[in-house]
């Protein structure tokens, strides 16, 4: 089971229980919630890449509708919430990236189906683990 993490926006301290306030700052603060330590580490890495100029427009928990064709046109049957989206530098161009972080243990059949369906809609999904891209 993944360990949930709340990261203080002010000082960056990690909290493993839902905090009322930050233990380091001593004040009420806002927190970023992550479903796992690995996802929080990936977010920190993406922020470093932003500072280095390698990526831009980083966003978290972006929702993509999963569509199918019904008798009266397109129907949304589910949603995929991607962990991160960003633009990655590729020479002189910027390439949009949709990324989902998964534990090394693998992904659920439900998640695999949603990723395949989004890719069928023309959106490539980069699946990352602690060991790198899958």
Language-model features: locations:
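Electrostatic, structured charged patches in enzyme active sites and in nucleic-acid/phosphate-binding
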Residues: 1-134
């Amino acid at each position: 089971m993944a360990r949930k993490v709340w990261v203080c926006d002010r000082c960056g301290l990690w909290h493993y229980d839902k905090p009322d306030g930050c233990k380091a700052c001593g004040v009420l603060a806002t927190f970023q919630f992550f479903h796992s330590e690995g996802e929080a580490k990936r977010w920190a890495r993406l922020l470093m890449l932003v500072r280095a100029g390698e990526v831009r427009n980083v966003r978290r928990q972006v929702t993509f509708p999963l569509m199918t064709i019904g008798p009266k046109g397109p129907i949304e049957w589910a949603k995929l919430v991607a962990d991160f989206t960003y633009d990655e530098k590729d020479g002189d161009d910027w390439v949009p990236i949709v990324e989902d972080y998964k534990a090394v243990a693998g992904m659920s059949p439900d998640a695999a189906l949603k990723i395949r369906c989004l890719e069928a809609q023309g959106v490539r999904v980069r699946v990352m683990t602690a060991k790198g891209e899958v």
